[in-house]
């Protein structure tokens, strides 16, 4: 069509970008793609990032907090830095003094993130984000704070999250690229995580078996998704005995009943109530819990070494449940059940570890 051929130019020569500019941006992109300081790969999407300043400190910290691939920071430096950032996120702000102390980082520097995906013979741009570095760092600190599930602050990397979205038995290590892109944007912008992230992680916990069923990363992601949606009802880092959420309480109760069963059998069981009932208890509690309570009263409590301790724990939770169980749990409530279960279990392990340390200290251990 002659009307589309401006000044007699056609195809790529009929463009609002000159050949000179094309060569320059191609050279710049190739430099970014060739530098590990400016690039990270998330499945089949490549993310390049850069700050509008000559020093590469911003990129280094960004890489270390999300991908663990910085040149200038080791694991100890990262954990120390993350602890300070999480403290600021807990307080609800990120101080300029903190940024100023971070190796001469300037909070007003423009920071760019570009998501690229190969598409046939071309590159497809998934996103282009430009933000002040202080805003980026604040949202990463918030992201890391929400993922913490123990009092010991440790960084959680995107590659770890991606791994936990996949069944350990699966030979396919691919995750929906749209899900990973939306998760990345939620981290950078501070908006809600995609519903598919919570749905996938809850499904993995319910369906998978063995030790890989639950871990800090999976439970941390579930907690993070819930807390961004539950305005004014935040799930804490560790066990919260004051939490009266019905699903959270049912999760705690399930952990107590499982622990009671294990103690009643002197920890000799290869299969516990978790293996038999966890999936159904987290979705249809009314169908499962009356049966488990009867088992506890008729068998487990009679054989346990400390029946009064468990009877007291069960009673404390049952009082807050008003003696009844919901008929079913929504996806959100299934997540709350899982976190309640995990945190109650962690509290048991922490108590056991503390007792073991005291036995060693006073020479009373076996």
Model-identified regions with their sequence ranges:
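Extended alpha-helical scaffolding segments
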Residues: 1-366
